[in-house]
Structure formats: structure tokens, C-alpha cells
Amino acid sequence: RAACGDGVDVVRSMPNTPAMVGKGVTAICTDAKSDPAVLDWAEELLTAVGMVFRVDEEHFDAVTGLTGSGPAYVFAFAEALIAAGAEADLPAEVLEPMVTQLLSGSSALLAAQGNPAGLREAVTSPGGTTAAGLNVFSEQGLRALVANAVAAAKTRSRELGAS
């Protein structure tokens, strides 16, 4: 706003890199001085690269930490799965396509059915292999680790916005 002046409608947006393949998440907002219709225009434009969510300005740093940085978290998880597959002696040439399809298929299933907890429970047999792996996630604090990563990115976004 300071750079543009009061006579210019301003839309703040936070896209992410999956927009490059039409599967992005973009958050948008405007301030009280801008014409609210400008959000309709921005949303229409940005739906070309994925889903658009209108959020309040106060939530933008959290959006940055979750969906702006989120693709890197998913890619880091993919790297970890590939490395774990290599440690389990799977052939190197199948690891990346296998993990890519795993993530793509799981995302498609989640998009089709929703309810990530229910989907996780459906694939987890009590005392089975999946339960053993998920127990490690629980014991080593996966949820806290992810929450801390999002919080750190949110804090850094706030710091960058203040400078």
C-alpha cells in the first residue's frame, strides 16, 4: 500500500509452486481501501493455476508457512521415502517413480474422499506393518515436527514482512 498509494487497489496473494502444473494453492486478500470487486477479478485470474482461498490479512503469515512452504515439506518427505527405500535395498531406478506415484495416488484418494484420518485408519491393520511404521511417527513426534516447521516459516514470513 505504501509503495502504490491510496488510489490503487491492492491484492495480496500467496501462490505455491504446484501452480506451475495447475495444481497450486493461492491465498488472496485485500485491504479496506481496495474495491472488494478486485478480489473477484484476482480469484478468477488465479483459478487458472489451481485453487484460490480468500483469507484475512492476519492469516497470511500462517498461509505462507503452511501452503507457501508446504511443497518443500512434501518434497523433503519424498526424499526421505526415497532414501528409506534405498536403505531397504530397493533398486535405485524404481525409487523416484514409485514414491512419486505413491504421493500422487494418495493425494488423489484424499481429494476424492477427504477425511485423512479415516483413510489412514483404513490402511492400518492393528499390529500390522503400517501400524508399526506409524508408531515410529508417533513416538518420534511427527505432528510436533510438522507444526514446528510451519510455525518457523510463519515466524520468518512475519519477519520478512516487517523489513
Which residue ranges define each predicted feature?
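Thr-Gly-centered strand-to-loop micro-motif
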Residues: 29-30, 69, 133
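Hydrophobic packing residues within well-ordered alpha-helices of enzyme cores
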Residues: 1-4, 133
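A short glycine-threonine-serine/GTX helix/turn-capping micro-motif
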Residues: 63-72, 120
